[in-house]
Amino acid sequence: MTFSRWLSDLVRSSLGVGVRRLRSVSATIGVIGADSRLAQSFGSFGRGSALLFPQGVIYNEKYIRIGSGTLVGPDVCLTVGMGPSQEMLTNPVVSIGDRCVIGRGSHVIGHWSILIGDDIQTGPYVYITDQNHGYEDLDVPVGLQPTKEASVRIGSGSWLGANCVILPGTDLGRCCVVAAGAVVRGSFPDHTVVAGVPARAIREFKDGEWRRPKG
């Protein structure tokens, strides 16, 4: 190995170590915890909760409540309304309970009411919203049509798999499981496993045993 090659490899290795250390330090000091100034801008922010670094887009956080012991992963977006400083008709708009884990890159987009219970875990890149565009006028681009809101509730103890989508009007009972990639709308009782596009119940716990739903 020539001296120039050795020096180039040494510099590259040293830079790599420096970048990794900087990333580690940034991840540590960039956390938003209950005692941080930014946490005070939320409607409430429970003890032991944290928003990991780097955070995604966050605005109108005064309408967002986060319980205790909840971990929000990196790049998670938490937004209320169409833009910062919009005054909302309901408060809170987004409520995340105690001891939840929101996976990396997930989006919680609230306009009316999103209630996420306690002890809920999501995989990465889950999308939860209570608003969608209408499609009544075929001559108007869908993105320009009036929006419609419908409350979302996710029952305590539920698990949402990676890349699933929770649409307006969804009402999940306690301890439900949503399969990865499912697109969910509608009501599902406690202890139901839902999967598919559109999602449907594939297992439910009734009379002391797991059953495949009829129909």
Question: Which residues does each PLM region occupy?
Answer:
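A generic "structured core" feature
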Residues: 159, 173, 177-179, 183, ...
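Histidine/lysine/aspartate-rich catalytic loop segments that bind and position anionic ligands
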Residues: 117-139, 144, 149
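Conserved coupling/switch loop of ABC ATPases
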Residues: 110, 168, 186
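Conserved hydrophobic/aromatic beta-strand scaffold that supports enzyme active sites
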Residues: 183-185, 193, 201
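Conserved catalytic-core motifs of eukaryotic protein kinase domains, centered on the activation segment
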Residues: 132-133, 139-140, 170, 188, ...
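Domain-scale signature associated with acetyltransferase and cell-envelope carbohydrate enzymes
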Residues: 1-129, 155-157, 164, 174, ...
